[in-house]
Every structure is written in structure tokens, then in C-alpha cells.
Amino acid sequence: MGDKAGTRVFKKSSPNCKVTVYLGKRDFVDHLDQVDPVDGVILVDPEYLKDRKVFVTLTCAFRYGREDLDVLGLSFRKDLYISTFQAFPPIAEERKANSRLQERLLKKLGQQAHPFYFTIPQNLPCSVTLQPGPEDTGKACGVDFEIRAFCAKSIEEKIHKRNSVRLVIRKVQYAPEKPGPQPMVETTRSFLMSDRSLHLEASLDKELYYHGEPISVNVHVTNNSTKTVKRLKISVRQYADICLFSTAQYKCPVAQVEADDQVSSSSTFCKVYTLTPTLDKNREKRGLALDGKLKHEDTNLASSTIVKDVTNKEVLGILVSYRVKVKLVISRGGDVSVELPFVLMHPKPTELPISRPQSAVPDSDPPIDTNLIEFETNSFSQDDDFVFEDFARLRLKGMADDKDDDC
């Protein structure tokens, strides 16, 4: 692969190989003030096109029920956003300046290639998948973004799988460069028949954690009451706000520790507990929110959702947050608990170079981008420094394929 380093481009063709879509990436980042534009190129066989038009659609959909329950004309799916772009013949009012990658692809692919553009609205949710149960089949519930390209005389014409291209992209967020303040919370509890109180203070070592990183929870108890703390329960909880027809919140523990540490009357206690929330220990929990999936490789717990304007009621989809709960189990009832919110996300990846000079000879094979799978030999000449990759379909545990054969 050392001689094929360069600009990587994702491609996917229709089953009849007459329509092919090219995209420079599959993950589009929400920067809070704007979202990466979706710009690509569609290549159509001129003999197949004839007098038809070329359309590309971008759809953001929320599936909130199993696909096998879609009966009697009822669908457990709501389209949150649909945008249509006519790539050919082009509409003058919709034309935009081509990106550098589009210009290079158009030059490479010839006159039968046409650019398309989409702008993802900021109020749309990020891609999230709800973990299916062991017996679930069909498409998993969650929010996904799909691009579909096809040829038709009009947009209302029925679209057939064999002559259209469907591919799933993701809207993602990465960890902010400046994390928030260190979480700390305290509470004081008074008990009946006790003159003095119990004081609980809990804190985390930081506010922002990356996936797979251990979380240190510092617990400090000052027990001046006559009660005895029998044990402590520390848990990491995922909260998923489902914003659709109405707002509902679901919580699920993703890591927990139960310690038999006792705090007797008129004593103090201090200890640091460590928890690491991972998907590996939660694979059987149906409905757990996961990061949107694009390929057969594994995913992870859903990243925290960062909302620019928390008062915006137009945000639909699934909003994910995390909290650490510290609970003191007190003798004869009257438990005491506090919660510490934190952020769980991926770090912003290092930007890869757009292209490598032809004269540069790598010492070893370049690392494979995690977005790239199923390497395909580049049949084009090397002068434009392109590497074309097949665009893999969405797969999940217990999830069937699209049933449209690639060429």
C-alpha cells in the first residue's frame, strides 16, 4: 500500500453499476457554530441516464420501533429532515463553488460526473444507535443520516434498489478543546432524633473523559450523626433524552461499584473509587445508546451530546448525558445521594494530509484510517493521487444487510 498513499475517497455503486457516489469522508463534524458541509460527486452512465434527471437526497431519520413491527401502513420511523438536490441538469440557483476535492474528482471522472452539496442544519441530532436486544432483527432504533442517489424523470418517481445508491453518513461531535470545571458536589443530611448531621462531599478528578478512560470518584464523608453508613454504591449512569412527539428520559447504569465500607457515628471517611464505563460490560442491555455505526467493526457507548443553546426546543432526536451517582446506604433507612455530571467523548482526531507528494517514499505502510475498509485497487492513473475505497454498509449485531448486492 506504500505506493498508494494519497487522498482517500469513499465510493459506492448501485447494484447495476450505473450510478456511483464519491464522498471525501463519512463523518461530518458538528462544530456548534456550523456543521461540515456534505459535498460529493455522482457519476452516471450516460446510456443509462438518457432523458432522466439525477437526484441526490439527504435524510435524517429517527427509527423508534422495530422494523418488523411496521404493519398496516404504520411505520415506527420519523423523518426529521429531508433535502433534495438536483445534480443534473444543474439548477443555477442551487449551484455553489466546488470544493477542491470536487474539482479534482470532476477532472478525474469526466463529463458524466456531477457535484452535489448539502448543509446539515445545526438543530439536527448526532448519529446515535440504540442497542438491539438479543432477539431483535432488522434495522436498529436510533438516529441516522442517509444519502440516496438515483436517476428519475421526477423526484416523485418510485426508486428501485438496483439502480440507486444508499449510504449512511454520521453527524458527530468531538471533545471540546477547553474542558469545563472539575465537578464537585456536597450535601448535608439531618436525621430525626439526631442533633447533628451527616455531610457528604464527592468530586471527580476532571470534567471531560475519553471513551475507555477510568473515572476517579473522590468520596469524603463526615458523619456527626447517630446513624451508621453501612455501605456505599457508586455508579455511572447514561441518560438518554428522547425528543420526538414528547420528551422522555431513560437512564441506564453502565458501570457500578458497591463497597462494604462503613462509616460509624462521629467519624470521617475518605476514599477514591475508580470506574470505567465501557460497552463490553453492557452488551446485553437493550436500548442502551451507542455512537452511530457505519461498519461491521465495534462501536462504543454514545458520546455526550453538546447543545449550543439548551433553551432551543426544536432539537429532536436523542440527547445523551452522563452522571456519576454516589449513594450512602444508611442504617434504618434515609439514604443519602449526590450526582456529578461529566462529559464522555472522543478526542478530535488529528487531521490527515490531503495528499502526499509523488516523490515522497514512505518508510512503511501508512496507517489505515479507521473510516476506510475493504480496500479497492485504484484503477485510475496515479497522477491525481487518489485512493478509492468501497463504502461499507451499516451493520449491527443481529442486524440484516441491506439485501442489495454490490457490483
From Swiss-Prot:
Transmembrane segments annotated in the record for this chain: none
Protein's GO biological process: G protein-coupled receptor internalization; nervous system development; positive regulation of ERK1 and ERK2 cascade; signal transduction
Record's signal peptide: none
Primary location: cytoplasm
Protein name, as recorded: Arrestin red cell isoform 1
InterPro entries xref list: Arrestin (IPR000698), Arrestin-like_C (IPR014752), Arrestin-like_N (IPR011021), Arrestin_C-like (IPR011022), Arrestin_CS (IPR017864), Arrestin_N (IPR014753), Ig_E-set (IPR014756)
Similarity section: Belongs to the arrestin family.
Keywords: Cytoplasm, Sensory transduction
Source taxon at top rank: Eukaryota
GO CC field: cytoplasm
Organism: Oncorhynchus mykiss
GO molecular function list: angiotensin receptor binding
UniProt-annotated location(s): Cytoplasm
Organism phylogeny: Eukaryota, Metazoa, Chordata, Craniata, Vertebrata
